[in-house]
A protein has these predicted regions:
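Intrinsically disordered, low-complexity Ser/Thr/Pro/Gly-rich regulatory segments
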Residues: 1-224, 228
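Short glycine-/polar-rich loops that comprise or flank the Walker A/P-loop
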Residues: 41-42, 69-73, 96, 129-135, ...
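Structural beta-sheet core signal
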Residues: 47, 75, 135-137, 285, ...
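Conserved P-loop NTPase-based nucleic-acid remodeling module centered on helicase motor cores
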Residues: 68-71, 77-111, 130-132, 143, ...
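Conserved nucleotide-binding/hydrolysis micro-motifs of P-loop NTPases
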Residues: 71, 80-83, 141-144, 290-293, ...
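Arginine/glycine-rich "motif VI" loop of SF2 helicases in the C-terminal RecA-like domain
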Residues: 108-109, 115-130, 277, 306, ...
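Alpha-helical nucleic-acid-binding subdomain
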Residues: 219-236, 240-258, 265-476, 480-498, ...
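Core RecA-like ATPase module of SF1/SF2 helicases and allied nucleic-acid translocases
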Residues: 442-485, 492, 498-507, 521-522, ...
């Protein structure tokens, strides 16, 4: 039998490590299931899986749930009861002594759980009456001979049972199939049916796309056709994402993921799952980009509805799960303002706090940590966009730790009274999307040198029970592969004549973000080939569109660039069938002053030619937020119906569109050695779900670098030079 979590394949899911009197018995059955199904393809196995019984409005948890392409759904209810604790049996009721419950009806309980899952499958015509349903009761502390001697096997209502010796046998799968009670007959599933079953078990099934009222095209323009195909595309279930989204770690957890890998969706799922599983917990889901608020609320609500079979919806006013911007203000609470207000904190400022928003926040967090003893108010905190809360300046850190993270840590209750240094802080990040700093929220930066050993050191990569301490997400679902590789190449400077500015310098870390590497990083000047397999960029747009997905144009003047922009957007709306809002996004590149000026000029150009624009945080379309009173602004808003959003990069983070227009490339190219400016370009390129149109004014050396990055596609070869700026990477435990 395989004895370690590392030895098992990723098909096994521990929802939460649990510690109770019967745990050893459940663990024994779970270990036997994992050993038996370890080499079996097309199956998923869960240790505890909440099932909501809608008509009774209660939630049950099958101790072990097996979902198999050939065998269907199997529910195993484990009872750690000994033979002398069962006094007599009447029907399916077991009357007990010295046990926590009497009578016991394990079979009925497990059948109810299975019926709910089978009914969910039967709601879909593709699966109706096709998924086999089986149920068993496992008694790991009772042998078959003990059961027989008591006369229980002669009962007419004796349920199908896995006895102690069955669990220890090598042919457990055969025993389960022969023993289990069949609740619904069925058949082995076809590939399409199996994919749908996985979606039903692991996440919301996407509803069919309904054409909206408005302009209709007959036939559909090519780009509109592509979008509709992409909307109907449902990729195969990502086993790693199920692990991340449906597990509750007993201690800190770090999630490193490339742009478009689904970090935000997964953190919303994880927060909703934790809230559903532990409704008494105080949980905070924290993010940096304020325009993500509505998206986060929507995603959390959708996941809660899924977990509760549409019985529970998210109510920000009453829920113990709080969705918080990192800052917060008088109109909407954030992480800092919530801690500030609940602790009666009053900081006296001798002078105005200086710096950009992350620096100001870190400064205030450090002062709070230095001057106050923080009382814990949360049971779990999940942080998205973690790279934006990590700062370079030592004076903004608290001791050797990032101040914002350490304030969050102090606001957490210990997982258990006897482990005061064990707390549930979960953070996700992509170092390539950092816009203001080069620091990376590694475990050492977040927790300090001593506590960071929780995620490393002698403890290994797994917590007890089989939940990983850290993840690296390598699949990009949003951005097409060639756009992503071009974004990484230009963002890190792979093709710079002087050598890359920033990047990863070992094969293992490249593999963790989905690349294959040929070459030796230890040899300066040696050729390195980096390629990205299609399997790690599953967006299928290249199957539907034969033209360029990423185009780059240079114009003689800003006026020419903006005229080309409005012509392309006019084409997108009136000929390509794209909706102004959410299908199209304009992102302005450059420093704060440059991007503000160019944003205004671009918006005015669109309006002049009859295209409504929307500037994020404005009240209405065709308005500029800086001309509005504070109370009239909508800081959470990023889109406006029937208007094209024109955004600077800081507001655009976390958002996406099918057609992304990037303007102001020259603002990056004239200062091409700036890592933060190149990161702007990376973030902007990876907002796309299909196409990018990139443009700038005037020729710069970086223009040829951009053209070459586009030309190279998914494979790049360059002579390695040690990065001039920073080295990206942190040990990802295996």
């Amino acid at each position: 039998m395989v004895s370690t979590a590392q030895g098992y394949k990723c098909k096994f899911f521990t929802v939460e490590p649990i510690f109770f009197n019967g745990q050893r018995a459940e663990q024994k059955v779970w270990d036997a299931v994992r050993s038996a199904f370890n080499d079996r393809e097309n199956c998923l196995c869960f240790w505890t899986y909440p099932v909501f019984i809608k008509d009774k409005k209660i939630c049950f948890e099958p101790d072990i749930l097996i979902v198999d392409k050939e065998l269907g759904i199997i529910v195993i209810e484990v009872k750690n009861i000994r033979i002398n604790q069962i006094t007599h049996i009447e029907g399916y009721n077991w009357f007990t002594q010295n046990f926590f419950k009497s009578p016991l009806n394990a079979y009925k309980q497990s059948k109810n759980q299975l019926h709910q899952l089978i009914n969910s499958c039967n709601n879909y015509p593709l699966l109706k009456q096709k998924v086999k349903g089986r149920v068993l009761v496992a008694l790991p502390s009772i042998t078959e001979s003990q059961w027989t001697r008591k006369g229980f096997s002669e009962q007419l209502c004796c349920p199908p049972i896995l006895f102690q010796e069955d669990i220890d046998r090598d042919n457990l799968i055969q025993t389960i199939v022969q023993t289990a009670g069949q609740v619904q007959p069925g058949k082995p599933l076809e590939d399409k049916e199996w994919r749908l079953l996985q979606k039903i078990i692991c996440g919301p099934v996407l509803p069919p796309i309904i054409n909206e009222e408005g302009k209709t095209f007959n036939p559909l323009p090519p780009r509109r056709q592509v979008i509709e195909k992409l909307q109907q595309w449902v990729g195969s279930t990502d086993i790693e994402q199920i692990h991340i989204g449906m597990s509750i770690p007993p201690e800190p957890q770090r999630i490193r993921g490339i742009a478009g890998s689904g970090k935000t969706v997964l953190l919303c799922q994880k927060a909703a799952w934790m809230h559903w599983y532990h409704p008494d917990w105080d949980i905070a889901l924290v993010f940096f980009t304020r325009s993500l608020y509505d998206q986060a609320v929507h995603l959390v609500n959708e996941w809660l509805k899924f977990f509760s079979n549409d019985e529970v919806e998210y109510d920000p006013e009453t829920s113990k799960l709080k969705i918080l911007h990192a800052w917060g203000d008088d109109r909407q609470p954030g992480l800092y303002s919530t801690i500030h207000d609940t602790q009666n904190i009053s900081l006296i400022h001798d002078q105005r706090v200086k710096g950009n928003p992350p620096e100001k926040l870190a400064y205030l967090c450090k002062r709070v940590l230095s001057e106050y003893q923080i009382q814990p108010i949360f049971d779990a905190i999940l942080i998205d966009e973690g790279q934006d809360l990590a700062l370079d300046e030592q004076q903004l850190k608290f001791e050797d730790k990032q101040s914002v993270y350490w304030l969050a840590w102090q606001a957490l209750r210990p997982v258990a009274p006897d482990t005061p240094d064990v707390r549930r802080l979960i953070w996700a990040y992509d170092e390539a999307q950092s816009l203001d700093a080069l620091s990376i929220p590694t475990s050492k930066e977040v927790l300090g040198a001593e506590l960071s050993q929780i995620l490393g050191g002698n403890g290994g990569a797994w917590y007890e029970g089989g939940i990983r301490k850290a993840y690296a997400m390598r699949h990009c679902y949003r951005t097409p592969g060639n756009i992503l590789t071009a974004a990484h190449a230009i963002g890190m400077g792979w093709l710079r004549p002087e050598g890359m500015l920033t990047g990863i310098t070992n094969k293992k870390d490249w593999e963790h973000i989905g690349y294959e590497v040929d070459g030796d990083f230890r040899k300066i000047g040696e050729p390195i080939t980096i390629s990205r397999p299609l399997k790690n960029s599953p967006n299928p747009v290249h199957h539907f569109w034969s033209g360029d997905l990423l185009e780059f144009n240079v114009y003689d003047s800003c006026e020419a660039e903006l005229n080309a922009l409005r012509e392309k957007i006019h084409q997108n709306i009136h000929c390509d069938g794209l909706k102004p809002s959410r299908d199209i996004l304009v992102i302005v590149l450059g420093s704060q002053e440059e991007s503000i000026n160019l944003q205004k000029r671009a918006a005015q150009t669109l309006q002049k030619y009859g295209v409504d624009f929307y500037i994020p945080s404005a009240l209405n379309s065709n308005q500029f937020p800086e001309q509005m009173d504070l109370q009239d602004k909508r800081p959470n808003q990023f889109w406006k119906e029937e208007a094209v959003t024109v955004s600077r990069i800081y507001r655009a983070k976390g958002n996406e569109a099918y057609m992304v227009h990037l303007i102001g490339f020259n603002n990056i190219a004239k200062n091409e050695s700036s890592i933060s400016l190149r990161n702007q370009l990376f973030v902007a390129l990876t907002r796309s779900k299909a196409w990018v149109s990139l443009s700038g004014v005037g020729e710069y050396p970086m223009c040829e670098e951009m053209r070459q990055a586009i030309k190279n596609g998914n494979t790049f070869t360059f002579n390695y030079k040690k990065p001039l700026g920073r080295v990206i990477g942190e040990e990802i435990l295996t």
